[in-house]
Amino acid sequence: MNKAYYIGLMSGTSMDGVDAVLVDFAGEQPQLIATHTEAIPSHLLKGLQRLCLPGNDEINRLGRLDRSVGKLFALAVNNLLAKAQIAKEDIIAIGSHGQTVRHMPNLEVGFTLQIGDPNTIATETGIDVIADFRRKDIALGGQGAPLVPAFHQQTFAQVGKKRVILNIGGIANITYLTGNREEVLGFDTGPGNTLIDAWIQQVKNEPYDKDGEWAASGKTDQQLLAQLLSHPYFSLAYPKSTGRELFNQAWLEQQLSQFNQLDEEDIQSTLLDLTCHSIARDILKLAPVGELFVCGGGAFNSELMQRLAALLPDYHIDTTSALGVDPKWAEGIAFAWLAMRHHLGLPANLPAVTGASREAVLGGRFSAK
């Protein structure tokens, strides 16, 4: 059988590394061939975190970081290919998400901005790059996010089966597969790992709360939880998308200002419940019973999964590995899939999900030649 090799590159709002995946799309289902995670050097991580907040000298910093992130993404590709022992000539294209530094689709003139110069990636890998997937959807009046529901529909939809696919990265998003292959809903529910990561990084200088152990040692404060859940985003109708612009450390500190008496682990437990309650509320609005398959980093947080199960007693809950897709790499595979759709001239957005006026071929091609 002929191979159809594509590479997907993903670095999410958690900024916990660049995921690189090599995928073969020759068969009916995507086949994961090789994976690699490239750590983000601390100086680059600090620069990105700083750029995500309003500041001075932003254009100079943006330009430098755009190139630096491009070089890091290229390094991820070259290390992936070395690991897989596959030549660059065998790859049709790279699908690069880039690193989001602003996502503000609801302004009068909405925009989204991902950096990681695709020209640099193409030049340093010798492979054509397809990138800038979100801005066409925004140009068509959409949110530019989430984009993964189209991939979820293609890969996980089954006639007659109601399924929810939950992707928990920095931000959490859900795809509702109604059992009718043509009908799909999807949107960002709110914070995924972003606030629980930010709090443990601030207090304990640890990158993340492994298995939710720190959250499990605390007790949720119901008053704080109610205040956090009163954020206007949670009552917005979909299509909707969000990011660090709404849910960030500055917002968290503002919310905590009236709760100085709380223990740090109680705050962590409350933040985990914010993630779980906001997800569960939105799922229950779609359907009271069904199947839920989880992917993204949150799928590996056992405390999160237990709390979600308690809030959704009539759901059968598993990870996407039960459907043949490794939950750790699902989003990287989705961006390889988006590259394939562009290469074949096929649309990749779902107007019912993003609010765009029509379907469209997403992204632009940056030649290695």
From Swiss-Prot:
The lineage of its organism: Bacteria, Pseudomonadati, Pseudomonadota, Gammaproteobacteria, Alteromonadales. ATP binds at residues 12-19. It holds the Pfam family AnmK. Its EC number is 2.7.1.170. CDD domains: ASKHA_NBD_ANMK. Coiled coil: none annotated. InterPro entries: Anhydro_N_Ac-Mur_kinase, ATPase_NBD. It catalyses: 1,6-anhydro-N-acetyl-beta-muramate + ATP + H2O = N-acetyl-D-muramate 6-phosphate + ADP + H(+). One of its GO terms (biological process) is 1,6-anhydro-N-acetyl-beta-muramic acid catabolic process. Belongs to the anhydro-N-acetylmuramic acid kinase family. Pathway: Amino-sugar metabolism; 1,6-anhydro-N-acetylmuramate degradation; Cell wall biogenesis; peptidoglycan recycling. GO terms for molecular function: ATP binding; kinase activity; phosphotransferase activity, alcohol group as acceptor. The keyword Acetylation does not apply. It comes from Shewanella sp. (strain ANA-3). This is Anhydro-N-acetylmuramic acid kinase. It is an enzyme of class 2 (transferase). Keywords: ATP-binding, Carbohydrate metabolism, Kinase, Nucleotide-binding, Transferase. It comes from the Bacteria. Catalyzes the specific phosphorylation of 1,6-anhydro-N-acetylmuramic acid (anhMurNAc) with the simultaneous cleavage of the 1,6-anhydro ring, generating MurNAc-6-P. Is required for the utilization of anhMurNAc either imported from the medium or derived from its own cell wall murein, and thus plays a role in cell wall recycling.
